[in-house]
C-alpha cells in the first residue's frame, strides 16, 4: 500500500545557474549522481515519497527550475503553487551566495498571498578546499531570513536526504498546526489517500449498539 | 540519462499505484450495502459488488412489471392494467419502507425507519423497489451455495409464520443478535420515506426483514448455481406478498407470464459480467492516469497551462493598451496564427499516409528532430524519442531495432542518444523472456507505454512553449512556428495512434487463445487510452496558441521599436 500518502507537498528548487539544483534532486529522487548534466530548460519535475513518521508518507513533487537568467521570467510563474523551497548556492561560488537575497526577494513578490518555507542549502560541500563561503556567514544569513541552513553534496551524498526530509517535516508540522492549510486553487499542499475502512466499521459498531438496547 | 532514471523511479512507484483502485472502490461498495461489508467474513470487493448490483438489478426486475430491461410487450399490451399494477407496486414499495402503522415491528425496524427518513430519497419511487429487492436478494444471493437448505427452510418458515400472523416477526427478532449488520443495510437504503404510506398492510416489510436476516446469517457465498434456492425464496415471497395485497397478485401473475426468476437472474448475471468487465477497464483507466502522472505528464501539462494562461493575459492586456489602428493590425496577425492552429485537422489527414509500422519509430525520431530544428528552439527530443523507442522495442519482440538513425541530428545529439541508451541495455537483455509475456503483461505494458509516450509528448510541447517564450536569440516568425508546431503535433498524434494500433495487434496475437470477454475489454481500453492520449497531446498543443501570440507580439514590437 505504498501509494497511500498523507499529503503531497510541492517543493521548488531555486538558485543560480550551475549551483547543482538538478544534481541534488536527482541524487534525492534517483539515488545517483550524474557527472554531466544539461542545463535545465524552464522547469523539470521529480517526485518521491518520504516517510516522516512510521506509516506516514508524504509525496514530494519537486519542481526543478532553470537557474539561467533567460528563463527567469518563466520560472517565476511556477513559484506560486509551492509550499516549500530549497534555495541553493554553491559554497565554492561566492556570487551564487550573494544572489540568495535576490532570489528570496523575487519569490516573495511572486508567491503572494502564499508563503514558501525555505531552507538555505550550501551545495557542493565535498569541495571544501575551494570553499568561498564560510558556514558561519551562511548560517547567519539563513537565520536573518528565518531559514534553516544545511550543507550538502550530491556527489558524495552528504545531507541530501536530510535537506529534503527536514524541510518536509517542518512543513508537515505547520500543516498539522493549521498554519498552512489546503486551499482551493493552490497546489502547494494536497491531501492524499487515507483508507476509510475504519470509518465504516465504526458506523457498524454504532448501529449495532443502538439496535441491541 | 535522466530518462532511464525517471523510469526506474516510476517503476518503483507503480507498485503503489496498482493498489489504489481496490481501496478506492471500497467506499462505493459500502454505500451500496453495508451488510456485506460488515459480515464477519468479508468477501472480496468485486464479487460483493457484483452480487449486490446483481441483486439490485434483479430486485428491480422482479418487483416491477415493466422494467426497462424487460421486453416491452407487457407494457404495450396491457398498458392500462400495467399502470394500475405499477401504482399498486409503488404503494407496496412505499409501504414496505414507512412502518409507522406497524404495531408489531421490532426495534430494528423502527430504527430502520428513522434512518430511512434521514436518508435522501434518490431515484423517486422506483428506487424503493430497487432497494427493497436489493436488501432481500443481495442477502439471498450472498448466501447461495452455502447452506442452501438452511436458507430455504428458514425463509420458508419465516414466510409461513408471517402469513399466519401479520404483526410480529419473530424470525427477525431472534436473528437480531447476530444479524444486526443487515439492519444497517436496510437502513441505508435510499428508500423514499417521505412518500406517503398508502396501503395499511405493512406485513410484507416485517416478513422481508425476517428473510433478510435468515438469509444473511446462514452463510456467505457468491451467486453461482444457487438459482433454484433464490427462485424458491422469490416464489414464496411473491405468494406472501400476493396474499396480503390483491394488487400485487396481478403483478405476480404478470411476472409469471413473462419470465421466470431464474431466467432473469441469469440475465442479470450476464449483465453483471459485462459490468464487471467495464469496471475493470475503469480501474485500468485510473491506472493510466496514475502512470501518466508518474511520468510527470500532469505536471508538464499544468506548467504548460500556467504559461498559457499567463500568455493569454499578457496578450489581452497588450491588446487593451493599443490604439485602434495598431490594434486592428495586430488582431489580424493574431487571428491568422489562430487560424493556423484551427487548421490542424486538415493537415492531419494530409499527413496520414501510412508507412510500414517498423519504420515508423525511426521515421518519427528523425521527423521530430527536424521539426524542432525548424522551430528554431533548442529543444532536444531525446526523452520523447527514447520513450517511443522503448515502446516500439517491446512490442516488436524479436525484431531488433537499429539504433536511431537520425539524419539531421548533430553529432552531439547522436552522442547523447548513445549515452542514454547504455543504461537501457539490461532491459534489452531480457528480450528473450518477453516473448513469453501474458496478455495481462502486454496490456499493462501497452497502457504504461501510452502513458509514458504521452507524458513525453506533453513535456516536449511544454519545453517548446518555454523556449518559444524565452531563451531564443533568433526568433522565427510565430506564423511559421505555428505551422511547424502543427506538423509536430500531428506527428505525435499519429505516432501515438500507430502505437496503440500496434499494441492492440500485439494483444490480439498474444491473447488469441483468450475468450473475447477477457480480451475485448483490454483491447478497448488500449484503444480508448490511445484516443485519450492523442486528445491530451492535442489539448496541450492548443495551449501553445497564446504562447505563440505573445511571442509574435514580442518580436513585432521589437521590430517596431527601433
UniProtKB/Swiss-Prot annotation, chain A:
Residues 67-83 are annotated as: Switch-II. Its cofactor is Mg(2+). It is an enzyme of class 3 (hydrolase). One of its GO terms (cellular component) is cytoplasmic vesicle membrane. Its main location: membrane. Its EC number is 3.6.5.2. It catalyses: GTP + H2O = GDP + phosphate + H(+). It is found in: Cell membrane; Cytoplasmic vesicle membrane; Golgi apparatus; Cytoplasmic vesicle, Autophagosome membrane. Residues 35-43 are annotated as: Switch-I. Mg(2+) binds at residues 22, 40, 64. Highly expressed in the brain. A lipid is attached at residues 211, 213 (S-geranylgeranyl cysteine). GTP binds at residues 17, 20-23, 37, 40, 67, 123-124, 126, 154-155. The modification Phosphoserine is found at residue 201. SUPFAM superfamilies: P-loop containing nucleoside triphosphate hydrolases. InterPro entries: P-loop_NTPase (IPR027417), Rab39 (IPR041818), Rab_GTPases_membrane_traffic (IPR050209), Small_GTP-bd (IPR005225), Small_GTPase (IPR001806). The modification Cysteine methyl ester is found at residue 213. It is a lipid-anchor. GO terms for molecular function: GTP binding; GTPase activity; myosin V binding. Regulated by guanine nucleotide exchange factors (GEFs) including C9orf72-SMCR8 complex, which promote the exchange of bound GDP for free GTP. Regulated by GTPase activating proteins (GAPs) which increase the GTP hydrolysis activity. Inhibited by GDP dissociation inhibitors (GDIs). The keyword Repeat does not apply. One of its GO terms (biological process) is autophagy. Interacts (GDP-bound) with C9orf72; C9orf72 in complex with SMCR8 acts as a GEF for RAB39B. Interacts (in GTP-bound form) with PICK1 (via PDZ domain); a PICK1 homodimer may allow simultaneous association of RAB39B and GRIA2 to PICK1 which is involved in GRIA2 trafficking. Interacts with isoform c of RASSF1; the interaction is strong. Interacts with isoform a of RASSF1; the interaction is weak. Interacts with the DLG4/PSD-95. Interacts (GTP-bound) with HOPS complex components VPS39 and VPS41. The small GTPases Rab are key regulators of intracellular membrane trafficking, from the formation of transport vesicles to their fusion with membranes. Rabs cycle between an inactive GDP-bound form and an active GTP-bound form that is able to recruit to membranes different sets of downstream effectors directly responsible for vesicle formation, movement, tethering and fusion. RAB39B is involved in autophagy and may function in autophagosome formation. Belongs to the small GTPase superfamily. Rab family. This is Ras-related protein Rab-39B. It comes from Homo sapiens (Human).
Amino acid at each position: 500500500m505504498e501509494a497511500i500518502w498523507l499529503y503531497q507537498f510541492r517543493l521548488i528548487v531555486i538558485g543560480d545557474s550551475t549551483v547543482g539544483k538538478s544534481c541534488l534532486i536527482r541524487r534525492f529522487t534517483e539515488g545517483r549522481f550524474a557527472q554531466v548534466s544539461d542545463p535545465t530548460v524552464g522547469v523539470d519535475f521529480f517526485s518521491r515519497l518520504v516517510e516522516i513518521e512510521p506509516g506516514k508518507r508524504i509525496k514530494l513533487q519537486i519542481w526543478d527550475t532553470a537557474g539561467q537568467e533567460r528563463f527567469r521570467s518563466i520560472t517565476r510563474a511556477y513559484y506560486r503553487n509551492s509550499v516549500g523551497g530549497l534555495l541553493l548556492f554553491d559554497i565554492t561560488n561566492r556570487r551564487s551566495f550573494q544572489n540568495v537575497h535576490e532570489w528570496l526577494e523575487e519569490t516573495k513578490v511572486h508567491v503572494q498571498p502564499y508563503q514558501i518555507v525555505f531552507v538555505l542549502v550550501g551545495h557542493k560541500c565535498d569541495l571544501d578546499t575551494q570553499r568561498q563561503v564560510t558556514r558561519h556567514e551562511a548560517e547567519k544569513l539563513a537565520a536573518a531570513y528565518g531559514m534553516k541552513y544545511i550543507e550538502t553534496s550530491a556527489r558524495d551524498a552528504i545531507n541530501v536526504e536530510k535537506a529534503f526530509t527536514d524541510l518536509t517535516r517542518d512543513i508537515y508540522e505547520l500543516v498539522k498546526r493549521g498554519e498552512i492549510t489546503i486551499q482551493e486553487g493552490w497546489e502547494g499542499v494536497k491531501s492524499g489517500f487515507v483508507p476509510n475502512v475504519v470509518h465504516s466499521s465504526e458506523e457498524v459498531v454504532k448501529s449495532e449498539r443502538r439496535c441491541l438496547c | 540519462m535522466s530518462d532511464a532514471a525517471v523510469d526506474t523511479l516510476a517503476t518503483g512507484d507503480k507498485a503503489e499505484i496498482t493498489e489504489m483502485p481496490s481501496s478506492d472502490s471500497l467506499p462505493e461498495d459500502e454505500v451500496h450495502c453495508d451488510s456485506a461489508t460488515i459480515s464477519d467474513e468479508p468477501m472480496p470487493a468485486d464479487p460483493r459488488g457484483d452480487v449486490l448490483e446483481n441483486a439490485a438489478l434483479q430486485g428491480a426486475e422482479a418487483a416491477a412489471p415493466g422494467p426497462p430491461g424487460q421486453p416491452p410487450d407487457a407494457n404495450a399490451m396491457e398498458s392500462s392494467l400495467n399502470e394500475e399494477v405499477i401504482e399498486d407496486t409503488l404503494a407496496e414499495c412505499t409501504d414496505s419502507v414507512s412502518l409507522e402503522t406497524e404495531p408489531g415491528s421490532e426495534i430494528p425496524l423502527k430504527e430502520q425507519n428513522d434512518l430511512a427518513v434521514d436518508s435522501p430519497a434518490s431515484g423517486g419511487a422506483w428506487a424503493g423497489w430497487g432497494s427493497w429487492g436489493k436488501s432481500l436478494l443481495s442477502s439471498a444471493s450472498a448466501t447461495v451455495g452455502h447452506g442452501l437448505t438452511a436458507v430455504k427452510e428458514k425463509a420458508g418458515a419465516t414466510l409461513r409464520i408471517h402469513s399466519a400472523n401479520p404483526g410480529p416477526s419473530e424470525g427477525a427478532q431472534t436473528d437480531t443478535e447476530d444479524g444486526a449488520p443487515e439492519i444497517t443495510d436496510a437502513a441505508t437504503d435510499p428508500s423514499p420515506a417521505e412518500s406517503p404510506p398508502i396501503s395499511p398492510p405493512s406485513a410484507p416489510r416485517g416478513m422481508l426483514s425476517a428473510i433478510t436476516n435468515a438469509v444473511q446469517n446462514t452463510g456467505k457465498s457468491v451467486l453461482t448455481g444457487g438459482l433454484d434456492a433464490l427462485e424458491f425464496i422469490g416464489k414464496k415471497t411473491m405468494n406472501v406478498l400476493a396474499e396480503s395485497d390483491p394488487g400485487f397478485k396481478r403483478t405476480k401473475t404478470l411476472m409469471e407470464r413473462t419470465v421466470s426468476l431464474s431466467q432473469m437472474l441469469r440475465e442479470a448475471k450476464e449483465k453483471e459480467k459485462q459490468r464487471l468487465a467495464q469496471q475493470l477497464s475503469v480501474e485500468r483507466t485510473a491506472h493510466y492516469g496514475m502512470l501518466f502522472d508518474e511520468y510527470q505528464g500532469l505536471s508538464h501539462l499544468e506548467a504548460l497551462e500556467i504559461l498559457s494562461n499567463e500568455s493569454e493575459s499578457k496578450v489581452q492586456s497588450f491588446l487593451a493598451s493599443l490604439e485602434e489602428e495598431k490594434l486592428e493590425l495586430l488582431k489580424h496577425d493574431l487571428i491568422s496564427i489562430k487560424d493556423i492552429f484551427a487548421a490542424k485537422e486538415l493537415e492531419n489527414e494530409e499527413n496520414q499516409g501510412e508507412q510500414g509500422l517498423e519504420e515508423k519509430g525511426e521515421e518519427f525520431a528523425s521527423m521530430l528532430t527536424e521539426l524542432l530544428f525548424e522551430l528554431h528552439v533548442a529543444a532536444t527530443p531525446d526523452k520523447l524519442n527514447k520513450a517511443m523507442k522503448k515502446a516500439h522495442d517491446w512490442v516488436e519482440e524479436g525484431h531488433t531495432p537499429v539504433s536511431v538513425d537520425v539524419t539531421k541530428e548533430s553529432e552531439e545529439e547522436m552522442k547523447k542518444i548513445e549515452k542514454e541508451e547504455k543504461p537501457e541495455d539490461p532491459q534489452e537483455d531480457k528480450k528473450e523472456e518477453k516473448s513469453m509475456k501474458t496478455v495481462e503483461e502486454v496490456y499493462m505494458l501497452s497502457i504504461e507505454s501510452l502513458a509514458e509516450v504521452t507524458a513525453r509528448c506533453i513535456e516536449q510541447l511544454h519545453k517548446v512553449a518555454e523556449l518559444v517564450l524565452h531563451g531564443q536569440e533568433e526568433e522565427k516568425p510565430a506564423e511559421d512556428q505555428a505551422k511547424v508546431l502543427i506538423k509536430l503535433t500531428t506527428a505525435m498524434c499519429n505516432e501515438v495512434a500507430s502505437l496503440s494500433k500496434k499494441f492492440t495487434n500485439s494483444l490480439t496475437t498474444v491473447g488469441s487463445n483468450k475468450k473475447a470477454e477477457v480480451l475485448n475489454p483490454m483491447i478497448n481500453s488500449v484503444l480508448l487510452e490511445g484516443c485519450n492520449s492523442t486528445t491530451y497531446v492535442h489539448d496541450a498543443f492548443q495551449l501553445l496558441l497564446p504562447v505563440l501570440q505573445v511571442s509574435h507580439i514580442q518580436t513585432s514590437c521589437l521590430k517596431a521599436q527601433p
